């Protein structure tokens, strides 16, 4: 059976990816690096390396209404795609490999969870 999806808890926002250092320079934040480090083995375990491109990527955010009102869906996309690249599920985040990204919310009580899945473009 093809492993084309994974579930991750507590998605991080792109707003939390960078931390300022001297003179306006930005570096990846400690929180972002810890999130990547925690979720990298989960993605590698749950998903197979994709070998045929391009793909359609679907991101489903399972969270309560309060969390959804405080977080922008577009800010959740970049860290998730970065995670797929770091896990070597996809080689790069360009349109050569990802043709379409859809994001949707589904109400669920409890901690926010995200489901990442893909289908091949026909």
Task: State where each predicted segment sits.
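Acidic, proline/glycine-enriched N-terminal capping motif
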Residues: 1-122
């Amino acid at each position: 059976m093809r492993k084309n999806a994974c579930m991750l808890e507590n998605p991080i926002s792109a707003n939390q990816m960078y931390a300022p250092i001297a003179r306006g320079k930005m570096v990846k934040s400690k929180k972002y690096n810890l999130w990547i480090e925690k979720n990298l083995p989960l993605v590698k375990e749950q998903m197979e390396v994709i070998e045929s491109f391009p793909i359609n990527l679907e991101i489903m955010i399972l969270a309560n209404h309060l969390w959804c009102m405080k977080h922008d869906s577009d800010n959740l996309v970049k860290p998730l795609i970065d995670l797929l690249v770091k896990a070597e599920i996809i080689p790069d985040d360009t349109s050569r490999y990802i043709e379409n990204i859809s994001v949707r919310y589904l109400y669920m009580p409890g901690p926010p969870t995200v489901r990442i899945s893909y289908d091949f473009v026909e």
